[in-house]
């Protein structure tokens, strides 16, 4: 083959990749859920908990500028086959003067002092104990589109449908009167409203609590999305996920540029960007893995970070050529091969969420999402400078499919990690060259996740925007409100959140491998370790070195006892007394966790202070 033929061959390969990417995106936008749904009808869907249908009154509030109420319309509920009561605002009702649309319901109200609570997100509990409260969950971080309440009059779960990434969730208390409702931010869509807006109420019996709320959401999501399957079902076609579930997670970064605020909060160029520094070489990491294996840690899932061009968060979205400092491609391949020889999973970390001006692919900002006025969206500042939002639709149509192919060829296998992918809402783009709504960008995310399944064997990220629930196999942490509450209270501020329950785990513990929160990562304090155990989490460490290796070995010894639970549904979380809980799993296991400084008992079962006890295994 001569040089001309070789060049033509590479060109044709790129064309084919782009055609395949386009076909995949088209299938996603058309509602195709993947080949995994071929046997969707054979799935055993989780049952909906017992419901208790009662009247619900709901209204749509059409809001104008400065939050003026333009008009109110009473909504008629439509009973669904699964027992839910749906209230809908048609997109055609939205006139040009409407800024926001809110759906208010009489059941979603309470008074200060009422028994019960409001519930949202991963399991944030708000007691009815305040005169004034303003809690707004921005749509950018609304991981599950639901809200729930237990009051003396009503117990319900409500699910928002339509324009999934365009609404906030609010819990307000004014003079002791509480109300919870969604608000669709119509003026900030960046396009015409493209879907109707619906809230579906699932009313539960008076004795029901957050357990039934979570099971109702589980049933709803499984029925709504045929691609959602349990880990046990996924393992049938991707057996390496069984090894992932048995493994302690370790991420090791190898190179990067200095990150220091406010110095990093600028747009760098190739001429003035800071130099890339090598933290650790691939050969050094491999030697540390060997020591870990010799210490008795049999199963590890290593996520190799900082391998790409510019190091960790250095020149995103550019991945190639591989950064030379830690050992280049040759060293990276040695790490992949050597890690697998030890029986470990070795996969990589990518960032196809941010883009930096110092990236060779910047091209005047062509790759970035634009606001309607043409300016850039910015989501923070990292080693590469100001982090602008990457237009995933444009990336998928141009370079991303080829990048993923090349990354796989480096030797990564296991569960490829794409940073932030499921931690924030998909980024809208108003660039006339590649406009995309959040719904369209979500479809691209789905296509990318499926490609990761095919190339690497799995897909992982952080948090869990649950539109990708059927595709994501592992998340580094569910989200970080426990850390947020701790940090606020350390500074003398009262957190809006009163406490936490494992709503996410009750709904999806057997669907996505996870770690509860940022406070339950790395080497843990005894109390945070008990939270990790209570929530059924998988240990994770963000480095591997001589200092933390004893902590990793200790976590491994504990995890060996608990890891059979990773594939099991969490069926019930029961608070037996303050600080003493019993967690039940579908395989019959009972896990008692005692957070108190005294022994506790459940009948004949005694649990020592500050410890846990696993029975039925």
What spans do the regions from the language model cover?
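Carbohydrate-active enzymes and regulators
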Residues: 91, 305-308, 317-320, 410, ...
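Short, low-complexity, charge-dense intrinsically disordered segments
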Residues: 1-14, 18, 23, 27
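Conserved, mostly hydrophobic/aromatic
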Residues: 89, 292, 339, 419, ...
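Active-site-proximal substrate-binding groove within the catalytic cores of carbohydrate-active enzymes
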Residues: 162-167, 181-211, 273-275, 359, ...
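A mature extracytoplasmic/lumenal domain signature
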Residues: 91-93, 306-308, 420-422, 596
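Aromatic-lined carbohydrate-binding/catalytic grooves of carbohydrate-active enzymes
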Residues: 247-401, 413-414, 422-427, 431-433
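Carbohydrate-recognition beta-sandwich/jelly-roll modules
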Residues: 41-301, 307, 342-345
């Amino acid at each position: 083959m001569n040089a001309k033929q070789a060049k033509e061959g590479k060109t044709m390969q790129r064309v084919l990749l782009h055609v395949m990417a386009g076909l995949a995106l088209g299938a996603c936008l058309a509602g195709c859920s993947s080949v995994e749904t071929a046997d969707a009808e054979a799935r055993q869907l989780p049952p909906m908990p017992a419901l208790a249908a009662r009247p619900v009154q709901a209204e749509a509030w059409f809001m104008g500028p400065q939050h003026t109420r333009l008009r109110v319309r009473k909504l008629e509920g439509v009973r669904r086959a699964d027992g839910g009561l749906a209230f809908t605002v048609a997109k055609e009702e939205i006139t040009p003067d409407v800024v926001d649309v809110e759906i208010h319901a009489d059941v979603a109200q309470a008074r200060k002092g009422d028994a019960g609570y409001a519930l949202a997100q991963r399991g944030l509990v708000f007691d009815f104990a305040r005169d004034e409260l303003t809690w707004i969950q921005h749509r950018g971080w609304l991981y599950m589109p639901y809200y729930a309440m237990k009051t003396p009059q009503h117990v319900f779960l409500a699910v928002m449908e339509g324009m999934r990434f365009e609404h906030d969730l609010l819990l307000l208390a004014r003079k002791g009167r509480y109300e919870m409702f969604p608000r669709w931010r119509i003026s900030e869509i960046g396009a015409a409203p493209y879907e109707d807006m619906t809230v579906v109420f699932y009313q539960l019996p008076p004795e029901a609590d957050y357990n039934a709320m979570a099971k109702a959401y589980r049933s709803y999501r499984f029925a709504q999305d045929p691609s959602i399957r349990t880990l046990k079902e996924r393992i049938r076609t991707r057996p390496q996920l069984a090894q992932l579930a048995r493994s302690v997670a370790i991420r090791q970064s190898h190179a990067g540029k200095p990150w220091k605020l406010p110095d990093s909060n600028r747009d760098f160029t190739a001429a003035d960007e800071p130099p890339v520094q090598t933290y650790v070489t691939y050969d050094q990491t491999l030697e540390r893995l060997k020591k870990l294996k010799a210490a008795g840690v049999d199963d590890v899932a290593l996520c190799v970070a900082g391998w790409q061009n510019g190091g960790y968060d250095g020149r995103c979205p550019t991945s190639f050529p591989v950064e030379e400092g830690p050992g280049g491609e040759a060293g990276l391949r040695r790490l992949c091969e050597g890690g697998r020889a030890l029986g470990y999973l070795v996969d990589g970390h990518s960032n196809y969420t941010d883009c930096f001006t110092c990236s060779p692919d910047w091209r005047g900002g062509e790759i970035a999402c634009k606001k309607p006025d043409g300016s850039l969206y910015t989501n923070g500042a990292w080693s590469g400078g100001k982090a602008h939002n990457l237009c995933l639709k444009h990336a998928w149509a141009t370079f991303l499919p080829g990048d993923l192919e090349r990354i796989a060829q480096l030797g990564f296998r296991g569960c490829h990690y794409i940073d932030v992918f499921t931690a924030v809402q998909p980024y809208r783009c108003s660039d006339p060259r590649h406009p995309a709504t959040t719904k369209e960008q979500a479809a691209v995310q789905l296509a990318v996740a499926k490609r990761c399944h095919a190339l690497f064997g799995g897909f992982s990220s952080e948090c869990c925007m649950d539109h990708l629930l059927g595709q994501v196999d592992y998340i580094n942490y569910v989200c970080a409100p426990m850390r947020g509450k701790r940090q606020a209270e350390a500074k003398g501020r009262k957190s809006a959140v009163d406490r936490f329950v494992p709503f996410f785990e009750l709904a999806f513990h057997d669907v996505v491998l996870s770690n509860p929160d940022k406070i339950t990562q790395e080497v843990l304090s005894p109390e945070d370790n008990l939270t990790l155990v209570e929530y059924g989490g998988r240990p994770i460490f963000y480095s591997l070195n001589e200092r933390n290796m004893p902590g990793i070995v200790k976590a491994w010894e504990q995890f060996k006892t608990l890891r059979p639970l990773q594939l099991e549904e969490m069926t019930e979380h029961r608070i037996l007394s303050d600080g003493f809980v019993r967690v039940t799993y579908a395989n019959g296991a009972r896990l008692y966790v005692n957070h108190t400084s005294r022994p506790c008992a459940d009948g004949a079962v005694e649990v020592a202070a500050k410890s846990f006890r696993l029975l039925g295994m």
